[in-house]
């Protein structure tokens, strides 16, 4: 909660005068830190306009169930929410959505994986190219 809140605080501090449209792409781990599901959302509520929930180390849990639970914590009626699997598609959707709203200054926050190159699914590491690689690919860099 604190790290997401701090991140959004910093976005508002740096870009606030530009009235940023903030999109948050996030999931959270399965089988542990259950309170993180609510905390991530709580840290962004009222300031993030679009939430995209996705896979992030679900382990033995269904990633869609985790995403639905996170989605249930979004109490801001003005916020858009969606669940997009797999994670690569969620990142691509967030960037496409930002491009569609090019009348605003957009900030897309993709949190959770960073440069990690695996997801834990059913107790096993499954290769993942990493958020930074996906973002650069989608942006055409």
What are these regions (language model features)?
Residues 1-141:
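ATP-dependent carboxylate-amine ligase
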